[in-house]
Amino acid sequence: MSKILCVLYDDPVTGYPKSYPRDAIPNIKTYPGGQTLPSPKAIDFKPGQLLGSVSGELGLRKFLESRGHTLVVTSSKDGPNSRLDKELPDTDIVISQPFWPAYLTEERLAKAPKLKLAITAGIGSDHVDLQAAIKHGVTVAEVSYSNSISVSEHVVMMILSLVRNYIPSYQWVVKGGWNIADCVERSYDLEGMNVGTVAAGRIGLAVLRRLKPFDVKLHYIDRHRLSLDIEKELNLTFHPNVESMVKVCDVVTINCPLHPETEHMFDDALIAKMKRGAYIVNTARGKICDRDAITRALESGQLAGYAGDVWFPQPAPQDHPWRTMPYHGMTPHVSGTSLSAQARYAAGTREILECWFEDRPIREEYLIVDGGHLAGAGAHSYSKGNATSGWEEATKYKNGTS
């Protein structure tokens, strides 16, 4: 029997919900492009419940314990005295999330001789040192596409919020004001702007499709060029490199994976090549942007706004400069963990576990590392290497509600 260690974010400060605003969520049959949704043999939760927090347990406890496995669920993941570090040495399977990542570094993997499977409940497995996973024979899998549409919707929301200056306008209402000039002095129409995406995979392409009705000019870069049919359908302009694209764009949205080649891609030099007053929306990974370069660009006016829900490390310490920099629209990492998305990535996590325990192949699109090599989605989107350095700063986080 196996020991499964599941690292999830904390419950709401008001306690685990006893009821929800909606009685049901839409039943999505397929993903765009024909990929099927997660297909476990059964689930032990009602879609629309809070599954991604500690008490939600991804709906896995009944399934695992009825088969004799041990499930340990915790939010304690950072520092040498964390529950993660205490439980890891005799753990067979680790489940984590991008939103509250259990950083599986070389040091941690070396202390976990029994660990054979690391599952990301969601998409994006950069919290795992993939080179170390290959070295130690750990299979890495994630629930591809489970929250791609969720994230793409969040991107469009953030673009509109920045360009239309929504957050300051909302704050005037909360403060009891009616300061229209203050609201509109930084407000523009999105119509007619040039909008580009760094990567046009599942999320990036979904963003492009959702932006087309806004009558914008769409641009993209990707190491796998889209088909001519899609380029014609969306009237896309393909660029051979990121420098070419950012020079012409008013809005840039980042939708690529984090790996050594994309780490700190948006630094002082690249931002200086952008239009003055451009906007960046980053729901990919915080480390793709140089933290201090973003802050400097907002303070100087080179950027008109920056929004996103990804930070490095996560959770972000209270003194992280992105919390207080001007003209930002940051949120905690929530774009891919709506209640709708949770139902899908919880089901996908169970599907992966069922395959693992029954010695059936995990579907190819879920695999990142397998058999000592990058595999499946990992071979398509990642590169070997480590993007976890600096994770220790997450130990500085103190819950602002305590």
What does each model-identified segment do?
Residues 89-90, 111-114, 247-248, 273-276, ...:
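Alpha-helix C-terminal capping/helix-to-coil transition sites in glycosyltransferase folds
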Residues 166, 181-276, 384-402:
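Rossmann-like dinucleotide/phosphate-binding beta-alpha-beta segment
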Residues 277-402:
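Rossmann-like dinucleotide-binding domain for NAD(H)/NADP(H)
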Residues 124-127, 142, 146, 202:
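Residue-level detector of alpha-helix initiation sites
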